[in-house]
Protein backbone atom coordinates (compact mmCIF):
# COMPACT_ATOMS: atom_id res chain seq x y z
CA UNK A 1 0.00 0.00 0.00
CA UNK A 2 1.37 3.38 -1.05
CA UNK A 3 2.17 5.86 1.70
CA UNK A 4 1.59 9.56 1.01
CA UNK A 5 3.28 12.58 2.52
CA UNK A 6 1.13 15.43 3.82
CA UNK A 7 1.87 17.73 0.88
CA UNK A 8 0.87 14.97 -1.56
CA UNK A 9 -2.80 15.10 -0.50
CA UNK A 10 -4.13 16.41 -3.88
CA UNK A 11 -2.35 13.56 -5.70
CA UNK A 12 -3.53 11.04 -3.11
CA UNK A 13 -7.15 12.08 -3.67
CA UNK A 14 -6.84 11.74 -7.44
CA UNK A 15 -5.19 8.34 -7.19
CA UNK A 16 -7.85 7.16 -4.72
CA UNK A 17 -10.56 8.09 -7.23
CA UNK A 18 -8.57 6.31 -9.91
CA UNK A 19 -8.45 3.12 -7.85
CA UNK A 20 -12.21 3.34 -7.28
CA UNK A 21 -12.78 3.58 -11.03
CA UNK A 22 -10.50 0.64 -11.72
CA UNK A 23 -12.26 -1.43 -9.07
CA UNK A 24 -15.61 -0.55 -10.62
CA UNK A 25 -14.38 -1.65 -14.02
CA UNK A 26 -13.07 -4.92 -12.59
CA UNK A 27 -16.47 -5.66 -11.02
CA UNK A 28 -18.50 -4.81 -14.10
CA UNK A 29 -16.63 -5.14 -17.36
CA UNK A 30 -19.64 -3.78 -19.25
CA UNK A 31 -19.23 -0.37 -17.70
CA UNK A 32 -17.46 1.83 -20.26
CA UNK A 33 -15.02 3.68 -18.04
CA UNK A 34 -11.80 3.25 -20.00
CA UNK A 35 -11.84 6.88 -21.13
CA UNK A 36 -12.54 8.10 -17.60
CA UNK A 37 -9.64 6.03 -16.26
CA UNK A 38 -7.26 7.34 -18.93
CA UNK A 39 -8.32 10.93 -18.29
CA UNK A 40 -7.88 10.59 -14.53
CA UNK A 41 -4.50 8.84 -14.98
CA UNK A 42 -3.32 11.76 -17.08
CA UNK A 43 -4.60 14.28 -14.54
CA UNK A 44 -2.93 12.48 -11.61
CA UNK A 45 0.39 12.16 -13.47
CA UNK A 46 0.33 15.86 -14.38
CA UNK A 47 -0.46 16.84 -10.78
CA UNK A 48 2.40 14.70 -9.47
CA UNK A 49 4.87 16.10 -12.01
CA UNK A 50 3.84 19.69 -11.23
CA UNK A 51 4.14 19.08 -7.49
CA UNK A 52 7.60 17.47 -7.65
CA UNK A 53 8.95 20.08 -10.03
CA UNK A 54 8.68 22.72 -7.30
CA UNK A 55 9.40 20.98 -4.00
CA UNK A 56 10.57 23.13 -1.11
CA UNK A 57 13.67 22.08 0.87
CA UNK A 58 11.44 20.85 3.69
CA UNK A 59 9.33 18.80 1.29
CA UNK A 60 12.52 17.28 -0.12
CA UNK A 61 13.50 16.42 3.44
CA UNK A 62 10.22 14.55 3.82
CA UNK A 63 10.79 12.70 0.54
CA UNK A 64 14.35 11.78 1.58
CA UNK A 65 12.89 10.24 4.75
CA UNK A 66 9.95 8.52 3.04
CA UNK A 67 9.32 5.13 4.72
CA UNK A 68 9.08 3.38 1.35
CA UNK A 69 12.21 4.96 -0.15
CA UNK A 70 14.76 2.36 -1.31
CA UNK A 71 17.57 1.78 1.17
CA UNK A 72 21.18 0.70 0.76
CA UNK A 73 20.43 -3.03 0.73
CA UNK A 74 17.99 -2.44 -2.13
CA UNK A 75 20.63 -0.64 -4.19
CA UNK A 76 23.16 -3.31 -3.31
CA UNK A 77 20.83 -6.09 -4.44
CA UNK A 78 20.08 -4.27 -7.70
CA UNK A 79 23.57 -3.07 -8.63
CA UNK A 80 26.07 -5.45 -7.04
CA UNK A 81 26.40 -9.09 -8.04
CA UNK A 82 28.16 -11.78 -5.98
CA UNK A 83 28.01 -9.54 -2.91
CA UNK A 84 29.85 -11.00 0.09
CA UNK A 85 29.36 -9.02 3.32
CA UNK A 86 32.02 -8.76 6.01
CA UNK A 87 31.18 -8.26 9.68
CA UNK A 88 32.94 -6.77 12.68
CA UNK A 89 35.63 -4.17 13.27
CA UNK A 90 38.18 -6.64 14.74
CA UNK A 91 38.26 -4.44 17.83
CA UNK A 92 34.91 -4.45 19.64
CA UNK A 93 32.10 -5.99 17.65
CA UNK A 94 29.63 -5.78 14.79
CA UNK A 95 27.43 -2.81 13.91
CA UNK A 96 24.66 -3.50 11.41
CA UNK A 97 23.97 0.21 10.87
CA UNK A 98 26.78 -0.03 8.32
CA UNK A 99 26.73 -2.91 5.86
CA UNK A 100 29.78 -3.57 3.73
CA UNK A 101 31.62 -6.14 1.72
CA UNK A 102 32.86 -7.04 -1.74
CA UNK A 103 31.09 -7.80 -4.99
CA UNK A 104 30.95 -6.88 -8.65
CA UNK A 105 29.57 -3.73 -10.25
CA UNK A 106 28.94 -4.43 -13.93
CA UNK A 107 31.37 -7.31 -13.60
CA UNK A 108 34.09 -5.20 -12.00
CA UNK A 109 35.27 -6.16 -8.48
CA UNK A 110 34.48 -3.41 -5.99
CA UNK A 111 34.21 -2.72 -2.27
CA UNK A 112 30.73 -1.54 -1.26
CA UNK A 113 29.84 0.18 2.02
CA UNK A 114 26.51 1.69 2.99
CA UNK A 115 24.38 2.91 5.85
CA UNK A 116 21.22 0.85 6.22
CA UNK A 117 18.13 2.20 8.01
CA UNK A 118 15.99 -0.91 7.72
CA UNK A 119 12.54 -1.25 6.15
CA UNK A 120 10.54 -3.05 8.85
CA UNK A 121 10.28 -2.30 12.56
CA UNK A 122 12.51 -5.27 13.38
CA UNK A 123 15.07 -4.27 10.74
CA UNK A 124 15.12 -0.65 11.88
CA UNK A 125 15.93 -1.74 15.41
CA UNK A 126 18.60 -4.17 14.20
CA UNK A 127 20.22 -1.51 11.99
CA UNK A 128 19.70 1.22 14.62
CA UNK A 129 17.89 3.36 12.02
CA UNK A 130 21.15 3.77 10.10
CA UNK A 131 22.90 5.56 12.98
CA UNK A 132 26.28 3.90 13.30
CA UNK A 133 28.32 3.36 16.46
CA UNK A 134 32.15 3.52 16.46
CA UNK A 135 32.47 -0.14 15.49
CA UNK A 136 30.49 0.58 12.32
CA UNK A 137 32.95 3.24 11.19
CA UNK A 138 35.89 1.05 12.20
CA UNK A 139 34.42 -1.73 10.09
CA UNK A 140 34.28 0.74 7.19
CA UNK A 141 37.96 1.58 7.75
CA UNK A 142 38.80 -2.13 7.75
CA UNK A 143 36.96 -2.58 4.44
CA UNK A 144 38.65 0.44 2.86
CA UNK A 145 42.05 -0.85 3.96
CA UNK A 146 41.31 -4.19 2.28
CA UNK A 147 40.09 -2.43 -0.87
CA UNK A 148 43.31 -0.43 -1.03
CA UNK A 149 45.38 -3.57 -0.55
CA UNK A 150 43.60 -5.34 -3.41
CA UNK A 151 43.37 -2.28 -5.67
CA UNK A 152 39.57 -2.13 -5.71
CA UNK A 153 37.35 0.94 -6.15
CA UNK A 154 35.18 1.82 -3.15
CA UNK A 155 31.50 2.69 -3.54
CA UNK A 156 29.76 4.20 -0.52
CA UNK A 157 26.02 4.78 -0.12
CA UNK A 158 25.05 7.44 2.41
CA UNK A 159 21.71 7.36 4.20
CA UNK A 160 21.77 8.40 7.85
CA UNK A 161 20.34 11.04 10.13
CA UNK A 162 23.78 11.08 11.78
CA UNK A 163 26.14 8.98 13.86
CA UNK A 164 24.60 7.42 16.97
CA UNK A 165 24.86 9.96 19.85
CA UNK A 166 24.45 7.54 22.76
CA UNK A 167 26.69 7.44 25.81
CA UNK A 168 28.02 3.98 24.90
CA UNK A 169 29.11 5.26 21.48
CA UNK A 170 30.88 8.24 23.04
CA UNK A 171 32.62 5.99 25.55
CA UNK A 172 34.00 3.86 22.71
CA UNK A 173 35.36 6.87 20.82
CA UNK A 174 32.69 7.96 18.34
CA UNK A 175 34.47 11.15 17.28
CA UNK A 176 37.78 9.34 16.77
CA UNK A 177 36.08 6.60 14.74
CA UNK A 178 34.42 9.15 12.45
CA UNK A 179 37.75 10.95 12.02
CA UNK A 180 39.54 7.68 11.21
CA UNK A 181 36.92 6.79 8.62
CA UNK A 182 37.25 10.22 7.00
CA UNK A 183 41.04 9.82 7.04
CA UNK A 184 40.75 6.38 5.43
CA UNK A 185 38.61 7.83 2.63
CA UNK A 186 41.17 10.55 1.96
CA UNK A 187 44.10 8.10 2.06
CA UNK A 188 42.67 5.60 -0.43
CA UNK A 189 44.91 4.91 -3.40
CA UNK A 190 41.96 3.62 -5.41
CA UNK A 191 38.94 5.51 -6.79
CA UNK A 192 36.10 6.12 -4.37
CA UNK A 193 32.63 7.38 -5.16
CA UNK A 194 29.88 8.33 -2.71
CA UNK A 195 26.16 8.46 -3.45
CA UNK A 196 23.74 10.13 -1.03
CA UNK A 197 20.52 8.15 -1.47
CA UNK A 198 18.41 9.63 1.33
CA UNK A 199 19.62 11.62 4.31
CA UNK A 200 23.22 12.72 4.59
CA UNK A 201 23.46 13.80 8.19
CA UNK A 202 26.50 15.48 9.76
CA UNK A 203 29.74 13.63 10.57
CA UNK A 204 27.93 10.33 10.28
CA UNK A 205 27.61 11.03 6.56
CA UNK A 206 30.94 12.72 5.82
CA UNK A 207 32.76 9.72 7.32
CA UNK A 208 31.73 7.76 4.20
CA UNK A 209 31.43 10.63 1.73
CA UNK A 210 34.95 12.07 1.54
CA UNK A 211 35.24 10.75 -1.99
CA UNK A 212 36.69 11.60 -5.40
CA UNK A 213 33.14 11.93 -6.68
CA UNK A 214 30.13 12.79 -4.51
CA UNK A 215 26.72 12.28 -6.08
CA UNK A 216 23.23 12.90 -4.70
CA UNK A 217 19.85 11.61 -5.70
CA UNK A 218 17.57 14.41 -6.87
CA UNK A 219 15.47 14.50 -3.69
CA UNK A 220 18.15 13.53 -1.16
CA UNK A 221 19.46 15.96 1.47
CA UNK A 222 22.95 16.54 2.87
CA UNK A 223 23.66 18.78 5.86
CA UNK A 224 25.71 19.35 9.01
CA UNK A 225 22.61 18.92 11.20
CA UNK A 226 18.95 18.01 10.75
CA UNK A 227 16.51 20.89 10.11
CA UNK A 228 14.83 20.14 13.44
CA UNK A 229 18.16 20.24 15.25
CA UNK A 230 19.18 23.50 13.60
CA UNK A 231 15.83 25.11 14.42
CA UNK A 232 16.15 24.04 18.05
CA UNK A 233 19.61 25.61 18.31
CA UNK A 234 18.99 28.78 16.30
CA UNK A 235 15.46 29.65 17.37
CA UNK A 236 14.81 27.34 20.33
CA UNK A 237 11.87 26.03 18.33
CA UNK A 238 11.97 22.71 16.46
CA UNK A 239 8.71 23.75 14.81
CA UNK A 240 10.70 26.09 12.57
CA UNK A 241 12.37 23.16 10.82
CA UNK A 242 10.97 24.35 7.48
CA UNK A 243 12.78 27.69 7.87
CA UNK A 244 15.98 25.89 8.85
CA UNK A 245 15.78 23.55 5.85
CA UNK A 246 15.61 26.54 3.52
CA UNK A 247 18.38 28.47 5.27
CA UNK A 248 20.86 25.58 5.40
CA UNK A 249 20.92 24.85 1.64
CA UNK A 250 20.54 21.10 2.10
CA UNK A 251 19.13 20.07 -1.28
CA UNK A 252 21.09 18.48 -4.11
CA UNK A 253 20.37 21.49 -6.31
CA UNK A 254 21.78 23.96 -3.76
CA UNK A 255 24.82 21.80 -3.01
CA UNK A 256 25.68 21.34 -6.69
CA UNK A 257 25.54 25.10 -7.13
CA UNK A 258 27.83 25.55 -4.11
CA UNK A 259 30.31 22.95 -5.39
CA UNK A 260 29.84 20.54 -2.48
CA UNK A 261 28.70 17.69 -4.74
CA UNK A 262 29.67 16.76 -8.28
CA UNK A 263 26.42 15.61 -9.87
CA UNK A 264 22.71 15.03 -9.29
CA UNK A 265 21.19 11.65 -10.09
CA UNK A 266 17.63 12.09 -11.41
CA UNK A 267 14.77 10.32 -9.66
CA UNK A 268 11.50 9.07 -11.15
CA UNK A 269 8.62 11.55 -10.95
CA UNK A 270 7.28 11.32 -7.42
CA UNK A 271 10.55 10.12 -5.91
CA UNK A 272 12.61 6.92 -5.90
CA UNK A 273 9.96 5.09 -3.84
CA UNK A 274 7.45 5.29 -6.71
CA UNK A 275 9.68 3.48 -9.18
CA UNK A 276 12.70 1.89 -7.46
CA UNK A 277 13.81 0.09 -10.64
CA UNK A 278 14.14 3.42 -12.48
CA UNK A 279 16.06 4.88 -9.53
CA UNK A 280 18.44 1.91 -9.58
CA UNK A 281 19.06 2.33 -13.32
CA UNK A 282 19.82 6.04 -12.93
CA UNK A 283 22.17 5.33 -10.02
CA UNK A 284 23.95 2.61 -12.00
CA UNK A 285 24.57 4.93 -14.94
CA UNK A 286 25.83 7.73 -12.70
CA UNK A 287 28.18 5.42 -10.80
CA UNK A 288 29.54 3.91 -14.02
CA UNK A 289 30.16 7.38 -15.46
CA UNK A 290 31.83 8.53 -12.26
CA UNK A 291 34.17 5.55 -12.10
CA UNK A 292 35.06 5.89 -15.78
CA UNK A 293 36.22 9.45 -15.15
CA UNK A 294 38.60 8.27 -12.42
CA UNK A 295 40.06 5.18 -14.04
CA UNK A 296 43.01 6.93 -15.65
CA UNK A 297 44.36 8.34 -12.38
CA UNK A 298 47.10 6.69 -10.33
CA UNK A 299 47.10 6.49 -6.52
CA UNK A 300 48.91 9.79 -6.00
CA UNK A 301 46.63 11.64 -8.42
CA UNK A 302 43.52 10.19 -6.78
CA UNK A 303 44.62 11.28 -3.32
CA UNK A 304 45.58 14.73 -4.57
CA UNK A 305 42.30 15.21 -6.45
CA UNK A 306 40.35 14.18 -3.36
CA UNK A 307 42.30 16.45 -1.03
CA UNK A 308 42.08 19.46 -3.34
CA UNK A 309 38.37 18.92 -3.81
CA UNK A 310 37.63 19.22 -0.09
CA UNK A 311 40.19 21.97 0.52
CA UNK A 312 38.45 23.98 -2.19
CA UNK A 313 35.09 23.49 -0.48
CA UNK A 314 36.65 24.85 2.71
CA UNK A 315 38.06 27.88 0.91
CA UNK A 316 34.81 28.74 -0.87
CA UNK A 317 32.35 28.12 1.94
Swiss-Prot record:
Pathway: Lipid metabolism; malonyl-CoA biosynthesis; malonyl-CoA from acetyl-CoA: step 1/1. One of its GO terms (biological process) is fatty acid biosynthetic process. It comes from the Bacteria. It catalyses: N(6)-carboxybiotinyl-L-lysyl-[protein] + acetyl-CoA = N(6)-biotinyl-L-lysyl-[protein] + malonyl-CoA. It is found in: Cytoplasm. Coiled coil: none annotated. Its EC number is 2.1.3.15. The keyword Lipid metabolism applies. The keyword Ribonucleoprotein does not apply. Keywords: ATP-binding, Cytoplasm, Fatty acid biosynthesis, Fatty acid metabolism, Lipid biosynthesis, Lipid metabolism, Nucleotide-binding, Transferase. Residues 39-293 form the CoA carboxyltransferase C-terminal domain. InterPro entries: Acetyl_CoA_COase_a_su (IPR001095), ClpP/crotonase-like_dom_sf (IPR029045), COA_CT_C (IPR011763). GO terms for cellular component: acetyl-CoA carboxylase complex. GO terms for molecular function: acetyl-CoA carboxylase activity; ATP binding; carboxyl- or carbamoyltransferase activity. PROSITE patterns: COA_CT_CTER. Belongs to the AccA family. Component of the acetyl coenzyme A carboxylase (ACC) complex. First, biotin carboxylase catalyzes the carboxylation of biotin on its carrier protein (BCCP) and then the CO(2) group is transferred by the carboxyltransferase to acetyl-CoA to form malonyl-CoA. Acetyl-CoA carboxylase is a heterohexamer composed of biotin carboxyl carrier protein (AccB), biotin carboxylase (AccC) and two subunits each of ACCase subunit alpha (AccA) and ACCase subunit beta (AccD). NCBIfam families: accA (TIGR00513), AccA_sub (NF041504), PRK05724.1 (NF004344). HAMAP family: AcetylCoA_CT_alpha. This is Acetyl-coenzyme A carboxylase carboxyl transferase subunit alpha. It comes from Methylobacterium sp. (strain 4-46). The lineage of its organism: Bacteria, Pseudomonadati, Pseudomonadota, Alphaproteobacteria, Hyphomicrobiales.
